[in-house]
C-alpha cells in the first residue's frame, strides 16, 4: 500500500483577500457589497457631519437668496440641515470638479448631491450585503426584501422625486425641520394625504406598531416560568435553548377570547411572516405613491364637489384641507414665485359686486 502526500499550493494574495472578504467568521461580515458600501457610507456620513456643522448658506431657489442650514451659521439641531442643491443646477450632476471654485460649489449646494448619491449607493449595497450574508449562511433571502421598503422610500424622496420635479432643489433637506418643510410643501403641491398609496403606508406603519406591541405584550405575558419570584424572568431564557420560551397556546387562547377565535394566529411562522409583511407592503406603497406624485399624478381632488340646489358650494373636509394646502402654497418659496399656479389658474372671483358710492 502506497500513501501519497501532496502539499497544497499556497493561495495567492488575491485568493486570501477573497476568502477574507467572503468569510462568515469575521466579527463583522464584509462581503463584496460591503467593499462598495463601506467607503460610500463613510463618505456620506463624513460630508453630512461637516456640512451640518459648517456649510455656508446655499442658494436653494436659484434666485440669489441663500438659505443657511449649518450650526455655525446660527442653526440648532432642530432647525439645521444640509440644504439641497440650487435650482440653478437643476438635475445636472454637480461634483466638486464641475464648479469653478470650492466657494461656488458650496454656494450651489454641492454637498447635498455628494451626500445623497453616496448614501443611496451605500444603502443599496447594504441591502445587497444582507442578501449576500444570508446566502453564505444558507438562510432564506427575506431580510433584504424587508429592508427594500425603507430603501425604496429613501430613493423616492432623494432621487425619484427630484427627477420628476426637474431639480434636486426639490429633494428632501437633510435635517429635522427640513424634513417637515418637505412634507408640508409636498402636501400643498400634491395633496398626498388624499392619495390612496399614502393611506396604505399610514396603515402599514401604524398597524405595524400596533401589531408589534400586541405581539410583544402577548409573548411577555405568556412566558414559561423558569425563575423564582425574586429573579428577573429574563434569566429563564438561555440563548440557543430548544424549548419554547413562551406558551403560544395560552397566548392564542387569550387573544382568541379577547377578540374572536380566527383573529388569533395558531401558527408561529405565519404570524411572524404577517408581522414582517404588513409594514413592508405599506411602505412599498408609500414609496410608489411618492414616485408617481413626483410626476404630478397627485392625490384625489374632491374640492367643491357638493352643491346645493342653487349651485352654492357646501364645504366638506376636502375643502377645508384645500384651504390649508393653499395657505402652504402661498407661504413657501415666497420670493421665487410671482403667484402660486394653483391660485393664478382659477377663475376670477369679484371682490365687490358694485362700486361703493362715495359721497363727497
From Swiss-Prot:
Cleavage (site feature) positions: 344-345
Chief location of this protein within or outside the cell: membrane
Residues annotated as binding Fe cation: 215, 272
Residues that, per the record, bind chlorophyll a PD1: 198
Bilayer topology annotation: Multi-pass membrane protein
Chain positions recorded as chlorophyll a ChlzD1 binding sites: 118
InterPro entries xrefs: D1/D2, Photo_II_D1/D2_sf, Photo_RC_L/M, Photo_RC_L/M_CS, PSII_D1
Subcellular location: Cellular thylakoid membrane
NCBIfam families, per the entry: psbA
Name this protein carries in UniProt: Photosystem II protein D1 1
Amino acid at each position: 500500500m502506497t500513501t501519497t502526500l501532496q502539499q497544497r499550493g499556497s493561495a495567492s494574495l488575491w485568493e486570501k483577500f477573497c476568502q477574507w472578504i467572503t468569510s462568515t467568521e469575521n466579527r463583522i461580515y464584509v462581503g463584496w457589497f460591503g467593499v462598495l458600501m463601506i467607503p460610500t457610507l463613510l463618505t456620506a456620513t463624513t460630508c453630512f457631519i461637516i456640512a451640518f456643522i459648517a456649510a455656508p448658506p446655499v442658494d436653494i431657489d436659484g434666485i440669489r437668496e441663500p438659505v443657511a442650514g449649518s450650526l455655525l451659521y446660527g442653526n440648532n439641531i432642530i432647525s439645521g440641515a444640509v440644504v439641497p442643491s440650487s435650482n440653478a443646477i437643476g438635475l445636472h450632476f454637480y461634483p466638486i470638479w464641475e464648479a469653478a471654485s470650492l466657494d461656488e460649489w458650496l454656494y450651489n449646494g454641492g454637498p447635498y448631491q455628494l451626500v445623497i448619491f453616496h448614501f443611496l449607493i451605500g444603502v443599496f449595497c447594504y441591502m445587497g450585503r444582507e442578501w449576500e450574508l444570508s446566502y453564505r449562511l444558507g438562510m432564506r433571502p427575506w431580510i433584504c426584501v424587508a429592508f427594500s421598503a425603507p430603501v425604496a422610500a429613501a430613493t423616492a424622496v432623494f432621487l425619484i422625486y427630484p427627477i420628476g420635479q426637474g431639480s434636486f432643489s426639490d429633494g428632501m433637506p437633510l435635517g429635522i425641520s427640513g424634513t417637515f418643510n418637505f412634507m408640508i410643501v409636498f402636501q400643498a403641491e400634491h395633496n398626498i394625504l388624499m392619495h390612496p398609496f399614502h393611506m396604505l403606508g399610514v396603515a402599514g406603519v401604524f398597524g405595524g406598531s400596533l401589531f408589534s406591541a400586541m405581539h410583544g405584550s402577548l409573548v411577555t405575558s405568556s412566558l414559561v416560568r423558569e425563575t423564582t419570584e425574586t429573579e428577573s424572568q429574563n434569566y429563564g431564557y438561555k440563548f440557543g435553548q430548544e424549548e419554547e420560551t413562551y406558551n403560544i397556546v395560552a397566548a392564542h387562547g387569550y387573544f382568541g377570547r379577547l377578540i374572536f377565535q380566527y383573529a388569533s394566529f395558531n401558527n408561529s411562522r405565519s404570524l411572524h411572516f404577517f408581522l414582517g409583511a404588513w409594514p413592508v407592503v405599506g411602505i412599498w406603497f408609500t414609496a410608489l405613491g411618492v414616485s408617481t406624485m413626483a410626476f404630478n399624478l397627485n392625490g384625489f381632488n374632491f374640492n367643491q364637489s357638493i352643491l346645493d340646489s342653487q349651485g352654492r358650494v357646501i364645504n366638506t373636509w376636502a375643502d377645508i384641507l384645500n384651504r390649508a394646502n393653499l395657505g402652504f402654497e402661498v407661504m413657501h418659496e415666497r420670493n421665487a414665485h410671482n403667484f402660486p399656479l394653483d391660485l393664478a389658474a382659477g377663475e376670477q372671483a369679484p371682490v365687490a359686486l358694485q362700486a361703493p358710492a362715495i359721497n363727497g
